[in-house]
Curated annotation (Swiss-Prot):
NDH-1 shuttles electrons from NADH, via FMN and iron-sulfur (Fe-S) centers, to quinones in the respiratory chain. The immediate electron acceptor for the enzyme in this species is believed to be ubiquinone. Couples the redox reaction to proton translocation (for every two electrons transferred, four hydrogen ions are translocated across the cytoplasmic membrane), and thus conserves the redox energy in a proton gradient. GO terms for biological process: ATP synthesis coupled electron transport. It is a multi-pass membrane protein. This is NADH-quinone oxidoreductase subunit N. The lineage of its organism: Bacteria, Pseudomonadati, Pseudomonadota, Gammaproteobacteria, Chromatiales. Belongs to the complex I subunit 2 family. GO terms for molecular function: NADH dehydrogenase (ubiquinone) activity; NADH:ubiquinone reductase (non-electrogenic) activity; quinone binding. It catalyses: a quinone + NADH + 5 H(+)(in) = a quinol + NAD(+) + 4 H(+)(out). HAMAP family: NDH1_NuoN_1 (MF_00445). The chain crosses the membrane at residues 11-31, 38-58, 74-94, 109-129, 163-183, 200-220, 239-259, 273-293, 301-321, 329-349, 372-392, 405-425, 451-471. Its EC number is 7.1.1.-. The keyword Cell membrane applies. It comes from Thioalkalivibrio sulfidiphilus (strain HL-EbGR7). It is found in: Cell inner membrane. GO terms for cellular component: plasma membrane.
Length: 480
């Protein structure tokens, strides 16, 4: 048996992030608390450098390395660059929050970078083994980040819930993968797909168990109903800077794992997992939108909102067409942008000794800051799917994909619950514009955050006016 040296070119961004994360961890040991901005600056440099490397190494051809366990293609390039940019925005929004609570530590950024590395591996994995390693690297980083504020009992409780349910989900996913390995004799996603095509065995009992465990494991990780119980507690209990991270970039990696595992690996069983995803999508749309109405805590409201958005993403996947996959990718990218702005606004209104977690904390925001009230209005309208924001076109693309495969009932169901969901978004707008402020203090004047948050909000309307800019990228990245 001859040993071949693998091609390291496709994994250079991963190696760069790994090396920099380890270096930052060591450098942070010697950086005094007053100079903690050095760690922050190096973390941002790492993300920018990784983005440049990924773009520079991008190729129209699909490349494999490490015995076909690692893939670099259009989907991986787009999602990785999106992860870098979203994480850079998350780090920028988080800095004043961490400083005000005396938890401005280098470990936050190091854990974030290791989480990014896990997402990169997930996005480019083409084997059950690499996919699971990337997933666990991300999960372990997130568990630690949720418990980052050690003085908060609520954060520790949320981290424990997240860890226990995350471990159960990982076990189910791993068990499903092990059954697939027993059936096909391979951990390689392409070989699993080839086996299912050539054997023509159909859905036998072992495959039913394998598919069920894989779907349940993925549903847990995505937070789809009925496996969503960790989402509101973790979003509420974690520091807002961590909720911001959990609610944005990992959704991009979650889409990648579905595309690699279900579409690439288990594509021949599409008609079987389509029904499972339909149930998850319907329940997520219904429960997410209805329960969100009863929330007075905006972090819990956005958590249930996330669950309903997962339902839309699953609708694009279950369509099983090129248009459906592109719509799901477009929707996920849009959601990450909008969610970053939403949680960024919560951080903007928070200050030392005060968490702007309740809807009432947004009362009269228009009187305190008309500009940021307008930014929050754009974000809420986009989440509700109001034209001409980009959220409207994201929902429209998914609905078109579902209608094309003659699942008109599902499209009607989604529209009905989108209208239901519009209530709690518009309630937030009403509170900002028509209620009197309880707090008259001016908003913080952190220039970098104010500028980026403004750009973040304006992107919602710019991409809504020119949706083709992002949609063309999403369509080009999908090769199925």
């Amino acid at each position: 048996m001859t040993f071949e040296i693998p091609d390291f070119m496709p994994v250079i961004p991963e190696l760069f992030v790994l090396g920099m994360a380890c270096a930052i961890l060591v450098i942070d040991l010697f950086v005094p608390q007053s100079r903690r901005d050095i760690t922050y600056g190096l973390s941002q440099f790492t993300l920018i450098g990784a983005a440049i490397l990924t773009i520079a190494l991008a190729s129209p051809e699909t490349r494999f390395t490490f015995n076909d366990t690692f893939i670099a293609d259009g989907l991986s390039d787009l999602l990785k660059v999106a992860v870098y940019l979203i994480t850079a925005v998350v780090f920028l929004y988080s800095r004043p929050y961490l400083q005000d609570r005396d938890i401005y530590k280098g470990e936050y950024y190091v854990l974030g970078l290791f989480g990014v590395l896990g997402m990169m591996i997930m996005i480019s994995s083409y084997s059950f083994l690499t996919l699971y390693l990337g997933l666990e690297l991300l999960s372990l980083s997130l568990y630690a980040m949720v418990a980052f504020n050690r003085d908060s009992a609520r954060a520790s409780e949320a981290a424990m819930k997240y860890f226990i349910l995350g471990a159960i989900a990982s076990g189910m996913l791993l068990y499903g993968m092990s059954i697939l390995y027993g059936i096909t004799g391979s951990l390689d996603i392409k070989e699993v797909s080839d086996y299912l095509i050539t054997s023509g065995a159909g859905l036998n009992v072992p495959l039913v168990f394998a598919l069920s465990f894989v779907i349940v494991g993925l549903a847990f990780k995505l937070g789809a109903v009925p496996f969503h119980m960790w989402v509101p507690d973790v979003y509420h209990g974690a520091p807002t800077s961590v909720t911001l991270f959990i609610g944005t970039a990992p959704k991009l990696a979650g889409l990648a794992i579905i595309m690699r595992l279900l579409v690439d690996g288990l594509g021949p069983l599409h008609h079987d997992w389509q029904g499972m995803l339909t149930i998850l999508a319907v329940l997520s749309l219904a429960v997410g939108n209805v329960v969100a109405i009863a929330q007075t805590n905006i972090k819990r409201m956005l958590a249930y909102s996330t669950i309903s958005h997962v339902g839309f993403i699953l609708m694009g996947i279950l369509a099983g067409t090129h248009e459906g996959y592109a719509a799901a990718l477009f929707y996920t990218l849009v959601y990450a942008i909008v969610a970053a702005g939403g949680f960024g606004m919560i951080i903007l209104l928070s200050r030392r000794g005060f968490e702007a977690e309740n809807l009432d904390d947004f009362r009269g925001l228009n009187e305190r800051s008309p500009w940021f009230a307008f930014i929050m209005l754009l974000i809420m309208f986009s989440m509700a799917g109001v034209p001409p924001t980009v959220g409207f076109y994201a929902k429209l693309a998914v609905l078109q994909a579902v209608v094309q495969v003659e699942m008109i009932w599902l499209a009607i169901f989604a529209v009905i619950f989108s209208i239901v969901g519009a209530f709690y978004y518009l309630r937030a707008v009403k509170i900002m514009y028509f209620d009197k402020p309880e707090d008259e203090s001016p908003l913080p004047k952190a220039l970098d955050m104010n500028v980026v948050l403004s750009i973040n909000g304006l992107l919602v309307i710019v991409l809504g006016i020119f949706p083709g800019l992002l949609m063309s990228l999403a369509t080009g990245a999908i090769s199925w």
